[in-house]
Regions:
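C-terminal and late-domain segments of enzyme folds
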Residues: 2-38, 47-61, 65-68, 147-241
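General beta-strand structural signal in soluble alpha/beta enzymes
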Residues: 13, 75-76, 101-102, 133-136, ...
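Class I SAM-dependent methyltransferase SAM-binding "motif I" and its flanking Rossmann-like core
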Residues: 103, 111-179
């Protein structure tokens, strides 16, 4: 379990499974790291907005139910797009949270909604003051330095890379890693920005890190690519970035 300590808070990169029982142990540990009896949680379902309002609101409701059951005070922050992300009230909600959760969907939409906005700045500031940040799938991708994006393209190659929030410098993330053929994942890795580390995070699995030390939690493995060199880590194992 991570304990409350000065400086930047923990970051959890989740391959899939947000708000499901399989992630309850991981999320409970992150809540405990706040040191509060009733931590405040902000849920950002922004990445799912392109999938429609029904999906967007379902993720918000699932997040509220999941974290309420873990003893948290939960506020879904209903940021649809970039305009909403410049709303001071939304930024304030992030600023008051002990844990900020970015759920899955479309990473390109999430990036374009948050970068250079009040909410984006509030997420970074929350991390720096000690709040836990959790990103699942698309959310995990944008907590890193850069991410790939497939949208509106007939050809996947070469990959198009976008800047992310850069809370984990020189790192890119492939979520749902065990759902991809690894030969395809290797092609992603080979096109990653020069000198970047790529983290492949299996479904129902998290890499939880602080101060450069990362532990694997959940059901699967984390695959760490340094260029063409690959290492795998299982539940409970630790690696450094």
């Amino acid at each position: 379990m991570l304990s409350r300590m000065p400086g930047p808070g923990p970051i959890a990169l989740v391959g899939s499974g947000e708000f499901l029982p399989v992630m309850a142990e991981v999320d409970a540990g992150l809540l405990a790291s706040s040191g509060r009896s009733r931590p405040r949680v902000a849920i950002l379902p922004t990445a799912s907005w392109p999938d429609g309002e029904t999906v967007f609101r379902r993720w918000a409701a699932m997040g509220a139910e999941h974290f309420s059951a873990l003893g948290a005070e939960v506020e879904p922050v209903l940021v649809l797009d970039r305009l909403d992300a410049d709303d001071e009230a939304h930024a304030q909600a992030i600023g008051e949270a002990d844990l900020v959760y970015l759920s899955g969907g479309k990473p390109g939409h999430l990036t374009e909604s948050l970068l250079g906005t009040r909410v984006g700045a509030a997420i970074v500031a929350a991390h720096e003051r000690g709040a836990a940040l959790v990103g699942c799938s698309a959310g995990a991708m944008i907590l890193a330095a850069r991410h790939f994006d497939f949208r509106m393209r007939r050809l996947l190659w070469p990959l198009r890379w976008q800047d992310s929030l850069d809370l984990i410098p020189a790192v890119t993330v492939i979520p749902h890693y065990d759902a991809w053929p690894e030969a395809l994942s290797a092609m992603f890795v080979l096109q990653a920005p020069r000198h970047f580390v790529t983290l492949g995070i299996d479904e129902d699995t998290a890499a939880v890190g602080r101060d450069g030390s990362w532990q694997v939690q959940g059901a699967g493995r984390v695959t760490v690519w340094h260029g063409r060199r690959r290492e795998r880590f299982r539940r409970g194992e630790v690696f450094r970035l």
